[in-house]
């Protein structure tokens, strides 16, 4: 029986994975700072409550697990101090605990906002004249970070920590630049949508692939309007099924509030005040 630690398990994505990741040879250890639903009869999960910045509690949570799915973080812009404490120091605490416990594999939840200032191919050129890096299948997942906010910077910092632990200690670390993971897409996030089922497919591939080392992958579905390449995910077996286009009929048109940043991957995050909690 393989045991997988999921941090931030009480959040939206954590709950999606709680429903979809368990299987006969896999059990989940669910860690969150807040309350979670207790295990249902026969559900192969263990529920823990602890703060990610509590090194002792995180070390205990990592003991005896085969892999970690690290979702715990502030989910949007916040003060610099909070961003550092939770998203950066918390990630370092988690990676160090995993290393000491001998956990060989970590899946980190990064974000498209780590690369939010990339432009859509065909959008107005940047003042610097730098073209959009999109290839025939979209922006490559290995594109260097261009964060759009303190939040986006913290996700880029988490990726860098993952790279450090992979190179220095031989761990396998996948950083997933996740788009908008919701049950159904909206007009404003249809290009970045990641369906719950595709999210589980991507995480499952990261947990089971023979690929090693450090990799950055885009966490998006097979959306017709996506900006991002799926080639790197395909190389390790990620084959998303869902497409936001299937929900077009139920969408309302994008409002004018999104127009100034429609050509930027990070959307409105690119213009929100830095350090102001959303």
Language model segments and positions:
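NAD(P)H-binding glycine-rich loop region in Rossmannoid oxidoreductase-like domains
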Residues: 49-86
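Conserved C-terminal active-site "lid" loop/helix of NAD(P)H-dependent oxidoreductases
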Residues: 216, 222-239, 251-277
């Amino acid at each position: 029986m393989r045991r997988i630690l999921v941090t931030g398990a009480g959040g939206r994505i954590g709950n999606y994975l709680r429903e979809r990741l368990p299987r006969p040879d896999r059990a989940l250890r669910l860690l969150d700072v807040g309350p979670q639903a207790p295990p249902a009869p026969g559900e192969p999960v263990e529920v823990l409550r602890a703060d990610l910045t509590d090194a002792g509690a995180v070390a205990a949570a990592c003991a005896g697990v085969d892999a970690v799915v690290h979702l715990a973080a502030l989910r949007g812009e916040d003060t610099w101090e909070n961003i550092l404490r939770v998203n950066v120091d918390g990630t370092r605490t988690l990676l160090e605990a995993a290393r000491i416990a001998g956990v060989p594999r970590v899946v980190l939840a990064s974000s498209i906002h780590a690369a939010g200032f990339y432009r859509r191919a065909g959008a107005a050129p940047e003042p610097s004249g730098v073209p959009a890096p999109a290839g025939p299948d979209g922006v490559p997942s290995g594109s260097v970070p261009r964060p759009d906010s303190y939040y986006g910077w913290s996700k880029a910092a988490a990726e860098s920590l993952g790279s450090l632990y992979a190179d220095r200690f031989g761990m396998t670390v996948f950083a997933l630049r996740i788009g908008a993971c919701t049950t159904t897409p909206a007009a404003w996030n249809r290009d970045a949508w990641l369906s719950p089922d595709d999210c589980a497919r991507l995480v499952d591939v990261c947990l089971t692939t023979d690929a090693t080392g450090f990799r950055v992958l885009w966490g998006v579905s097979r959306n017709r309007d996506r900006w991002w390449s799926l080639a790197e995910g395909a190389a390790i077996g990620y084959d998303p099924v869902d497409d936001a286009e299937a929900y077009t009929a139920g969408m309302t048109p994008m409002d004018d509030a999104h127009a100034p940043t429609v050509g930027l991957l990070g959307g409105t995050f690119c213009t929100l005040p830095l350090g102001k909690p959303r």
